[in-house]
Amino acid sequence: MKRLWLLCPIAILLLSAAAQEADPAGFEHWTPASLKNFESKMHADASTDPHHFAVKLLADFPNDSAMLVHRESDGQAEWHETQVDVFFVQSGSATLLIGGTLVNGETVGPHEKRNGTIQGGVRRKLSAGDVVRIPPRVPHQLLLEGASEFNYFVIKVKGY
C-alpha cells in the first residue's frame, strides 16, 4: 500500500507533463520583464552608436520580424516600398513625422530608402502605450524634440 501512495504522485506528474503540448512553431511570447532586460544593454549600445540608436532583433520570420528599439536622438527619414511598420511605444516620447515626400533618400537595401528629408507630412506625438501602423510607401521619421530617449517594439510585416 505504501508503494502505491508513492507511485500516485509520480504518475500524476508524468500524466500532466504528457498532457502539455509544445508551443507551435513560430510562436513567440515576450513579457514586459523580458523586454525590460534588454534596456540596459541597448542604452549602452546607443551611447557608442553615431546615431545614438540601438536595436535588438527578437525574431525574423519569412513574413514578419519583431525588434526592440532604443533611441536617444532623432531617427533617419525612412521609406519602405513593401513593408508595414507597427510601433508599440514602451516608454519615452517622440514626434512621428509621417507622409509627405522623401527628398534625396538613399537606397540602403531592397525596397528601402533612408536619409534625406521629408517635405510636408504631418506630426503625431507618441508616448507610452501608443500604437501606430505605417503603411508601405509612406515616408516617416521619429524626432525626439528634446526628449532624452524613446523605446518601442516594432513589428515589420514584409510584403514581398
Range-by-range predicted roles:
Residues A18-E81:
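A short, N-terminal "cap"/entry segment at the start of jelly-roll beta-barrel domains
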Residues W5-S16:
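Bacterial N-terminal signal peptides
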Residues G105-S127:
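An anionic, turn-rich surface loop/hairpin at beta-sheet edges
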Residues E78, D85-F88, R123-R124, V131-V132:
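His/acidic/aromatic-lined binding-pocket segments of jelly-roll/cupin-type domains
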